Amino acid sequence: LIDTSQALATALGMHADIVHCHAPLPRTLLNNTELLATYQQYLSDDAQQHHKAFDDLIGRHDIAPDAAHLLEGAPENMLPRFVRKHEIDLLVMGAIARGRLDTILIGHTAERLLESVDCDLLVVKLPAEK
């Protein structure tokens, strides 16, 4: 997806920013007091794991730090704000094929974003994980 985005940006004379959103488990979903006690540690660990994985990914693709953005929050909330703030013209997203039940329960992020981003949206189907 990064390679596709970078190639597209080059071909169109654009700049490619790489954005990843991560949303930790909301505290309101926790009803176990033992889990609540460790929630702050969970948040810290989750953020650390995402930062490490994102930094590794950015490093493998030689992306400048000012073009790499790790956002905490749900993509459908964070990406429209990012698009407006940075005046993005084209948002390129990856999508995976899910089963019908997953689609009903989780939905498609791209579908939720389609009407809320102020730019064109290109969805690239990613290869199925094996």
Model features per residue range: what roles?
Residues 1-40, 44, 60-63, 67, ...:
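Small/aliphatic-rich secondary-structure junction motif
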Residues 2, 44-55:
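Short, surface-exposed alpha-helical segments at coil->helix boundaries
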Residues 28-32, 80-81, 103-105:
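Short, well-ordered secondary-structure micro-motifs
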Residues 53, 75-80, 109:
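Short acidic active-site motifs
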Residues 70-73:
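Short loop/edge segments at beta-strand edges and connector loops
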Residues 90-116, 130:
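Glycine-rich, Arg-bearing micro-motifs that act as flexible, cationic patches
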